[in-house]
From Swiss-Prot:
Lineage: Archaea, Methanobacteriati, Methanobacteriota, Methanomada group, Methanococci
HAMAP family: Ala_tRNA_synth_A
Binding locations of Zn(2+): H596, H600, C700, H704
Localization per Swiss-Prot or TrEMBL: Cytoplasm
Name of the protein this chain belongs to: Alanine--tRNA ligase
GO molecular function: alanine-tRNA ligase activity; aminoacyl-tRNA deacylase activity; ATP binding; tRNA binding; zinc ion binding
Domain of life from the UniProt record: Archaea
Keyword Lipoprotein: no
Role this protein plays: Catalyzes the attachment of alanine to tRNA(Ala) in a two-step reaction: alanine is first activated by ATP to form Ala-AMP and then transferred to the acceptor end of tRNA(Ala). Also edits incorrectly charged Ser-tRNA(Ala) and Gly-tRNA(Ala) via its editing domain.
Length: 892
C-alpha cells in the first residue's frame, strides 16, 4: 500500500507553526520561528544549551524522572512500574530492554493482551551497547539511559488519542519546563522497528533531540506495509538529555554523575581540565557521527584546532577524564544489570554484563583509581535509591558477584601472556578476528593484548603488528546483543496443522482424575486426537503421561496449537467418530506431579540460599528424577546444597497448599511480577498460576500435587556446571529418594568392608590410604627415574647412523609420560628418537640441527600429529617396519 501522512496537527494550526525545509539536510520541519532556515538538529545546528540552561530550573536525574511522571499522571496517564533491563524475562527475541515500547511487545502491541493501563506513563531504564566505545568520549553517549514515555493504545472499541494530543502534550511539557517554544522544532520523519512502522516527529531544541513521537500503525511485510488494527502512540523522551539541557553542563555525565565524577577525579589525581575544552568537544561531537569518522582522531583534531592546542597534548589532558566519564556511566549500567538479576557468563545477557564490567575494570586500571568497583557501584546505588529502591535491595548479590568476577578477571589477565605468546609464534599479525576470539574465548581485553605485544616487540627481532580499533567493544557487543534466547523445541515430532477445536484438558480441573470418556475427532498416522483428555502432553520440561485408551497402550503424548496428539501402539483399533475410554497410569502421573512440584520448591529454596538473582533456565521432570538449571555466578558448595535440601524438606513438612488458578496476564504480572516466568515465556492473555502458599508463584501448565506434604523427601543427587553462569541440580523425591539413599549406603558399607573399618571411620581411613599412596607414588617415580637413567645408557648404544644423523627406533616398557622423559634425555644434537610401548603408543622427538619434521615423520610410520620437534600417536606395524620407513624417509 502507498503510505501518505499529513504531518499537520491541531497545535501547528492554532499556534501558526510554519512548515519549512532545512537548508542543510533538506528534511521538512515545523517551527514557530519565522526566521529559522535549519531544522535545529545537529549537525545542521550545534548545541547551544551548554553553558546556557534552557529550562527555568535545573533538574537532577531523579527530579526529572518525577517531573515527567507527575506531568503525565496529572493529565490522565496511569503511572506504570518499570520493567527489568533483562527483556528475556517476558520475551524471547531480544536480550536487553532497548526501549519503553519493548515492555509491551509482543503481547500488547500484537493485540493479544490488553495494556495494563491505557493511556499510561512509564520511565523505563534501557540498555544499548551499540555505542559503548563512544561513551565518555563524545559527551552525550550512554550505555544506560531512561526512556520516558506516554503510550496510548487505540482500538476500534477503545480510542484514546492520536497525533493532535500527542504533539500538544509534548509541547505543553516543554513549555512547563520553561523551554522557549520558538526554539522547538518538530522534524517530519519515519520510524521502523520490530516489524512495525509509522510516521514520527523528532522533537528538537538547541541542537539536541529531546523526544521522538511515533505513531505506530503499520506492519511491514517484505517491501510493503499493512495497516494494523491497534494504533499505538509510542513516544520516547530522553530523561538524561532533559536533565543535561536543564543544567547546561559541558557533558551529559556531569549532569548525571557530578558527585561520583568529583570523587573519582580526586581519587585518581586527575588534573583540572578547563570546562571550555570539554564543552567544545561535546559541541563538536554533536556535529559528527563518530562511527562514520572511523575513530576519534578526527574529533580530537577538530577540538585541538578549535582551541589552539597540540592534538597529542589534548589527548593526554582529556583522556583520563573521559575514562572517568565512562566508568561513571558503566557502573550505573552494571547497577541495573546486576540489580535486575543478570548473572555474568560467556553467553547472551551474561556475556554483555561481563563485557561492560571488564571494560570498566580496565579503565579503572588505566586511570589509577584506588576505589574498588564495589565502592563505585555502591555510590550509584545510593544515588538512585530514591527512584529505584529495589536496586539497593540487591546489594548483597551485587557485591558478591563483583568479588567473584574481579577474581576471574585477574586470573584471566595473569594467564593472558602465555596465550598471546603462543599465538605470536604462529603469526606475525594480530588481526581484529584474533582480538575478538581472544576476548570471546579467553576474556582478554584488547588493550591488555596490545600491552603484551608491545612488550614482546621490545625484545623480539620479528615485530608483531596489532591494531585495536576505537570501536572494538561496539563490534563485539553488536555480535552478541542480537543473540536470541534459545528456542526450546516443544515437539519431538513434526506434527501436522489441524483445523480442529482445542482439546479440553481435564487435568486442569482435577489432577486426580484418572479415567475419562472421549470422542475420536481425527486419526493421523499413529496418533489419535480426542475432544477431551486427562493425558498431559509433553511440555514445560515435564514428560508426557502414559496409560491406555480402549485397552491400547499410549506411548507418547504431544501438543500443537492446543490440540493433543495421543500416540498408540495399535492405531487399527480406532475409528474417527467412535467413543473411547481412557485410563491413566496414575502411579506414573503421581511421580511426575511430585517431581514437578519439587522443582518449584527447590527453586524457591535456591533463591533463599543463593539470592534473588537465581533464575530458572531449564528443567526436566521425569518419573524417577528431576533436573533444574539455574543461573548462578559460582559453583554451588556442599554447604549450600545441604542448606537447600534442608529448606526444601522443611517446606515439604510444613504441608503448604499448592493451588492452581487461571489469571489475566496483566493482573498476574501486577500481583506477582515477572518472577512468574521462571519456567519460560508463556504466550496468551490468560495464565495458569501455580502457587505454593507463601513460598513460590509461577506461570505453569504442568501437573502438581495439592499439598507439599505429598512430595515426600527431597534429595539433591548432584550438581554440575553445564555452562558458565548456569548450575544444574539433579534430584529425586519420595521413594525415589529412599532408593538413592539406600544405594549410597550400600556404597559406604561396601567401601568400609573392603577397608575393614566401621563406616564412621571411612573418611579418616581413606585419607590415610591416600597419603600413603602419595608417598608410595613418589618412591615409584624415583625408582622409575633411576630405571630410566639405566635404560638411557643401554639405549645410547642402540643409535644407528644415517648420513649426518643418528636415529634410535626402540620398543620399551612404560607409560607415555615415561617414554617422553626417556626421549627428552636422548634427543640431543643431531639425534632422532622413536619410542613405542605395548599399548600402541609411539612418539618421535628430535634434537637440534635435524631438519626433518617429526610431524611429517609420524604420519609416515603411524597415525598422529604434533609439532616440528615432537609428535605422538598410534602405530600398527612392527618395530622393524617402522625402522625401515624411518630410514627410507631420512635417506631421501
Amino acid at each position: 500500500m502507498e503510505i501518505t501522512h499529513d504531518y499537520k496537527v491541531k497545535l501547528f494550526e492554532e499556534m501558526n507553526f510554519e512548515r519549512k525545509q532545512c537548508s542543510e539536510c533538506k528534511q521538512w520541519f515545523w517551527t514557530l520561528d519565522k526566521e529559522r532556515i535549519t531544522c535545529g538538529d545537529s549537525p545542521c545546528d550545534k548545541y547551544s544549551f551548554i553553558g546556557n540552561p534552557i529550562t527555568t530550573k535545573k533538574y537532577t536525574y531523579n527530579e526529572m524522572v518525577k517531573e515527567f511522571t507527575n506531568f503525565f499522571d496529572e493529565r490522565g496517564h496511569s503511572p506504570v512500574k518499570r520493567s527489568p533491563v533483562i527483556a528475556k524475562r517476558w520475551r524471547d527475541d531480544i536480550l536487553l530492554t532497548i526501549a519503553s515500547i519493548a515492555v509491551f511487545q509482543p503481547w500488547v502491541t500484537n493485540g493479544l493482551v490488553k495494556p495494563v493501563k491505557n493511556p499510561l506513563v512509564i520511565t523505563q531504564p534501557c540498555i544499548r551497547l551499540n555505542d559503548i566505545d563512544n561513551v565518555g568520549r563524545t559527551g552525550r553517549h550512554l550505555t544506560c539511559f531512561t526512556m520516558g514515555a506516554h503510550h496510548a493504545f487505540n482500538s476500534k472499541d477503545e480510542y484514546k488519542y492520536w497525533t493532535d494530543k500527542t504533539v500538544e502534550l509534548c509541547f505543553e511539557l516543554m513549555q512547563k519546563l520553561g523551554i522557549d517554544g520558538h526554539t522547538i522544532t518538530f522534524i517530519e520523519s519515519w520510524w521502523e522497528g520490530g516489524g512495525n512502522a509509522g510516521p514520527c516527529y523528532e522533537v528538537i531544541t538547541h541542537g539536541v533531540e529531546l523526544a521522538t513521537l511515533v505513531f505506530m500503525q503499520y506492519k511491514k511485510v517484505g517491501n510493503n506495509y499493512e495497516e494494523i488494527p491497534l494504533k499505538i502512540v509510542d513516544t520516547g523522551y530522553g530523561i538524561e538529555r532533559f536533565a543535561w539541557a536543564s543544567q547546561g553542563t559541558p557533558t551529559v555525565y556531569e549532569a548525571l554523575f557530578s558527585d561520583i565524577i568529583e570523587k573519582l577525579k580526586k581519587n585518581a589525581n586527575i588534573p583540572i581540565v578547563d570546562e571550555k575544552i570539554m564543552a567544545e568537544s561535546a559541541t563538536l561531537a554533536g556535529l559528527m557521527d563518530i562511527e562514520n569518522v572511523g575513530d576519534l582522531k578526527a574529533l580530537r583534531q577538530k577540538v585541538a584546532e578549535k582551541i589552539g592546542m597540540d592534538v597529542n597534548e589534548l589527548d593526554r589532558l582529556i583522556s583520563p577524564l573521559e575514562y572517568i566519564y565512562a566508568i561513571s556511566d558503566h557502573t550505573r549500567c552494571l547497577s541495573f544489570m546486576f540489580g535486575d538479576g543478570i548473572v555474568p557468563s560467556n553467553v547472551k545477557e551474561g556475556y554483555l554484563a561481563r563485557l561492560v564490567l571488564r571494560k570498566t575494570l580496565r579503565y579503572m586500571e588505566k586511570v589509577g583509581i584506588s576505589y574498588s568497583i564495589k565502592e563505585i557501584i555502591l555510590m550509584q546505588l545510593e544515588s538512585m535509591k530514591e527512584v529505584y529502591p529495589e536496586l539497593i535491595g540487591m546489594k548483597d548479590y551485587i557485591m558478591d558477584v563483583l568479588d567473584s568476577e574481579e577474581k576471574k578477571y585477574i586470573q584471566t589477565v595473569n594467564k593472558g601472556r602465555g596465550i598471546v605468546e603462543r599465538m605470536t609464534k604462529l603469526k606475525s599479525e594480530i588481526t581484529l578476528n584474533d582480538l575478538i576470539n581472544l576476548y570471546d574465548s579467553n576474556g582478554l581485553p584488547p588493550e591488555i593484548v596490545k600491552d603484551i605485544i608491545d612488550e614482546i616487540n621490545k625484545t623480539s627481532k620479528t615485530k608483531i603488528s596489532i591494531h585495536v580499533p576505537d570501536n572494538f567493544y561496539t563490534i563485539v557487543a553488536e555480535r552478541h546483543e542480537e543473540e536470541k534466547a534459545e528456542e526450546v523445541a516443544i515437539l519431538k515430532h513434526e506434527l501436522p496443522e489441524l483445523d480442529l477445536p482445542k482439546t479440553e484438558l481435564l487435568f486442569f480441573k482435577n489432577t486426580m482424575q484418572s479415567e475419562f470418556e472421549a470422542k475420536v475427532l481425527k486419526i493421523v498416522d499413529k496418533y489419535i486426537i480426542l475432544d477431551r483428555t486427562v493425558f498431559y502432553a509433553e511440555g514445560g520440561g515435564q514428560k508426557y503421561d502414559i496409560g491406555q485408551i480402549s485397552g491400547v497402550d499410549v506411548v507418547d503424548v504431544q501438543k500443537k496449537n492446543g490440540i493433543v496428539f495421543h500416540k498408540v501402539l495399535d492405531i487399527s483399533k480406532f475409528k474417527e467418530g467412535n467413543l473411547v475410554k481412557g485410563e491413566l497410569n496414575f502411579e506414573n502421573r503421581l511421580k511426575l506431579m511430585r517431581n514437578h512440584t519439587a522443582t518449584h520448591v527447590i527453586n524457591a529454596a535456591l533463591k533463599q540460599v543463593l539470592g534473588k538473582h537465581v533464575w530458572q533456565t531449564g528443567s526436566n521432570v521425569d518419573t524417577e528424577k528431576g533436573r533444574l538449571d539455574v543461573t548462578h555466578y559460582e559453583r554451588i558448595s556442599r554447604k549450600e546444597i545441604k542448606e537447600i535440601e534442608k529448606i526444601a524438606n522443611e517446606i515439604v513438612l510444613l504441608g503448604k497448599p499448592v493451588t492452581c488458578k487461571f489469571m489475566d496476564r496483566n493482573d498476574a504480572e501486577q500481583e506477582y511480577g515477572f518472577k512468574i516466568y521462571q519456567g519460560g515465556v508463556v504466550p496468551g492473555d490468560t495464565l495458569r498460576i501455580v502457587e505454593i502458599d507463601g513460598i513460590d508463584v509461577e506461570a505453569c501448565g504442568g501437573t502438581h500435587v495439592t499439598n507439599t506434604s505429598e512430595i515426600g523427601y527431597i534429595k539433591v543427587l548432584k550438581t554440575e556446571r553445564i555452562q558458565d553462569g548456569v548450575e544444574r541440580l539433579e534430584y529425586s523425591t519420595g521413594m525415589g529418594s529412599i532408593f538413592e539413599i539406600a544405594a549410597l549406603e550400600d556404597i559406604l558399607l561396601d567401601s568400609a568392608e573392603v577397608l575393614g573399618v566401621p563406616i564412621e571411620n571411612l573418611p579418616k581411613t581413606a585419607k590415610r590410604f591416600f597419603e600413603e599412596w602419595k608417598e608410595q607414588k613418589k618412591v615409584i617415580e624415583e625408582l622409575q627415574k633411576k630405571v630410566g637413567e639405566l635404560l638411557k645408557y643401554e639405549l645410547l648404544e642402540k643409535f644407528e647412523k644415517v648420513g649426518n644423523l643418528e636415529i634410535l627406533v626402540e620398543k620399551v616398557s612404560g607409560t607415555s609420560n615415561e617414554l617422553m622423559a626417556i626421549a627428552d634425555n636422548l634427543a640431543t644434537n643431531g639425534k632422532i628418537v622413536i619410542l613405542m610401548n605395548d599399548t600402541d603408543y609411539i612418539l618421535c622427538k628430535k634434537g637440534e640441527n635435524v631438519e626433518i619434521s617429526m610431524k611429517e615423520l609420524i604420519q609416515k610410520i603411524g597415525k598422529g600429529g604434533g609439532k616440528e620437534n615432537l609428535a605422538q600417536g598410534k602405530y600398527s606395524t612392527s618395530k622393524e617396519q617402522i625402522r625401515e620407513k624411518a630410514f627410507e624417509l631420512l635417506k631421501q
